[in-house]
Swiss-Prot record:
Binding site for Mn(2+) 2: 209, 211, 307, 309
Protein name per its UniProtKB record: Putative agmatinase 1
Main enzyme class: hydrolase
Signal sequence, renumbered to the chain: 1-20
Gene Ontology CC: endoplasmic reticulum
GO molecular-function terms, A-Z: agmatinase activity; metal ion binding
The entry's keywords: Hydrolase, Manganese, Metal-binding, Signal
Classification via SUPFAM superfamilies: Arginase/deacetylase
Upper classification of the organism: Eukaryota, Fungi, Dikarya, Ascomycota, Taphrinomycotina
GO biological process per UniProt: putrescine biosynthetic process from arginine, via agmatine; urea metabolic process
Protein origin, superkingdom: Eukaryota
Amino acid sequence: MALQSLFLILLAGAAQLAQAHPKIFEQSRANAVETFDDAFPGDGETQADSVFSGIATFGRLPYWKCLNDKSQSFDIAFLGAPFDTGTSYRPGARFGPSGIREGSRRLNLYGGYNVPMETNPFNNWAKIVDCGDIPLTSYDNAVAIKQIENGHFELLTRKPTSYSEKDGYALDGSVLPRVITLGGDHTIVLPILRSVSRAYGPVSIIHFDSHLDSWKPKVFGGGKSSVGSINHGTYFYHASQEGLVSNDSNIHAGIRTTLSGLSDYDNDADCGFEIIEAREIDTIGIDAIIKRIRDRVGDGIAYLSIDIDVLDPAYAPATGTPESAGWTTRELRTILRGLDGIKLVGADIVEVAPAYDFAEVTTLAAADILFEVMSIMVKTPVYKEQAKQQSRFY
């Protein structure tokens, strides 16, 4: 009888515990969620949900139709240039801007802090937006090149959100916002440099690529017409001839292409460039490459152009003219971080052709590379310390 009573007491206690357990569990879970949300930055499930919803912008940045709406200001703008009719081998880079944006979806998922660079470009002083793409014709290269120049210049000469009261490096002494262009084949750099030169004058060039892209038109493409002479292998030759680049402060890095002959190197030197070949990473190392770039550019302003084919095809297969024996993504990102402190007035990444990609390998690499570029720009605003005069641009 006593044993039966004990059993009934235990059974009743178990029932009460089972009834109370859901409430205890829910309270425990609520406390855990509250603790997690309080302890870590970011916006949790709101940001996670946005990865799969809405239109794709770079890093989930705000989208503005900047070319149509002049009332909005910014410090850094992403701008697509979907142009690929200057290619010599595989086309498809016109889809690069959309592919790179897709590859960037997760950049800001957990807050966007760049650990090696010790900065968060998404949550800093700079107002950064995605301005969409420049509307371009695919039927007339001469018109498209002019459209790129005009679209870029329209954004480049806006009044920035920050530091507009400072003295800048523009020809009129003003501080200008910076544009990061998503290509597109490498031809787009000629109209971009025309835009940059109109605002700043000649600038130093830091160029990551497997190819020189400074060939004379008769060597690369035959130069059958004035329009046909401008392509993704000749734009630096034209930029040099037009006085858009600074003399003897420009540098290529990652070069490993075949040549028509050693005269190509002589012509490249005449265009004002020094060359770091891809294979030199095995002999002089990353630190020496960084030093050569910094020594070449000096303390002046610079423009950064990155062809995705500077990477080995194992790391970036989706490009128009792939070359084996290139750098790894890790090596390139490390070199870029070594450029911290250089005054970049603009940048681009080009030759991403998503149709040749698998598992978004190339577009992810391109997005991560631009994450480093963003970080450099945010860490180094481009202005002088003196008070400025009224800008003629705004």
